[in-house]
């Protein structure tokens, strides 16, 4: 698998970067936010991601390796495709995204057009699992869903529940989180 290409950037259109290396031309989809970093008619280092959908290869070029790695995590989440991954990466910097994922700020993801509560939670859970080894158990998911139905904010619930002991029963977990939520809301 290719990590990056260091090639001559001879053309940029509204969808693709076009690079030449050793008399071969390469075409990569790119983030609009990366455009300011690429230098036309110069050699550029472009980090590569490949996504295969129904035997069709799509190639993506990124200016930053960490952003590329985050993109690869996002497109491997069920129901999250290229457009949603690009939407997330276009609207927040890498550091902002790490903060959002680390602290479970679903409200920030929900601000993006077309992303609902379920998808935002799925994204946060998946990225936390991948980057920070945080796993939300089925038990914790039940408590989160119940408290959301009662009107509590998902981000507040996550801040509390992420560090709670797994040995608690659902009732004990719910009681503990409700108690902590009462301090946040007062």
From Swiss-Prot:
Gene3D superfamilies: 5' to 3' exonuclease, C-terminal subdomain. Residues 64-137 are annotated as: Domain II. The keyword Cytoplasm applies. Pfam families: HHH_5 (PF14520). Residues 137 are annotated as: Flexible linker. GO terms for cellular component: cytoplasm; Holliday junction resolvase complex. GO terms for biological process: DNA recombination; DNA repair. Residues 137-186 are annotated as: Domain III. GO terms for molecular function: DNA helicase activity; four-way junction DNA binding. Its main location: cytoplasm. InterPro entries: Hlx-hairpin-Hlx_DNA-bd_motif, NA-bd_OB-fold, RuvA, RuvA_2-like. It is found in: Cytoplasm. Keywords: Cytoplasm, DNA damage, DNA recombination, DNA repair, DNA-binding. Residues 1-63 are annotated as: Domain I. Coiled coil: none annotated. Transmembrane segments: none annotated. The keyword DNA repair applies. Has three domains with a flexible linker between the domains II and III and assumes an 'L' shape. Domain III is highly mobile and contacts RuvB. The RuvA-RuvB-RuvC complex processes Holliday junction (HJ) DNA during genetic recombination and DNA repair, while the RuvA-RuvB complex plays an important role in the rescue of blocked DNA replication forks via replication fork reversal (RFR). RuvA specifically binds to HJ cruciform DNA, conferring on it an open structure. The RuvB hexamer acts as an ATP-dependent pump, pulling dsDNA into and through the RuvAB complex. HJ branch migration allows RuvC to scan DNA until it finds its consensus sequence, where it cleaves and resolves the cruciform DNA. Homotetramer. Forms an RuvA(8)-RuvB(12)-Holliday junction (HJ) complex. HJ DNA is sandwiched between 2 RuvA tetramers; dsDNA enters through RuvA and exits via RuvB. An RuvB hexamer assembles on each DNA strand where it exits the tetramer. Each RuvB hexamer is contacted by two RuvA subunits (via domain III) on 2 adjacent RuvB subunits; this complex drives branch migration. In the full resolvosome a probable DNA-RuvA(4)-RuvB(12)-RuvC(2) complex forms which resolves the HJ. Belongs to the RuvA family. This is Holliday junction branch migration complex subunit RuvA.
């Amino acid at each position: 698998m290719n990590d990056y290409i260091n090639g001559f950037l001879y053309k940029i259109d509204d969808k693709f970067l076009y690079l030449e290396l050793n008399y071969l031309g390469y075409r990569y989809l790119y983030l609009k936010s990366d455009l300011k970093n690429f230098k036309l008619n110069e050699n550029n280092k472009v980090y590569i991601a490949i996504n295969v959908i129904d035997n069709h290869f799509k190639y993506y070029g990124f200016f930053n390796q960490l952003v590329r790695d985050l993109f690869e995590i996002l497109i491997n989440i069920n129901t999250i495709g290229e457009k949603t991954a690009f939407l997330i990466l276009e609207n927040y910097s890498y550091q902002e995204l790490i903060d959002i994922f680390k602290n479970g700020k679903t409200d920030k993801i929900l601000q993006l057009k077309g992303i609902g509560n379920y998808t935002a939670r799925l994204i946060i859970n998946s990225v936390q699992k991948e980057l920070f080894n945080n796993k939300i158990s089925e038990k914790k998911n039940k408590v989160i869903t119940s408290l959301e139905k009662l009107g509590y904010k998902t981000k507040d619930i996550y801040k509390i529940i992420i560090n709670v002991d797994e040995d608690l029963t659902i009732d004990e977990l719910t009681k503990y989180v409700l108690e902590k939520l009462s301090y946040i809301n007062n």
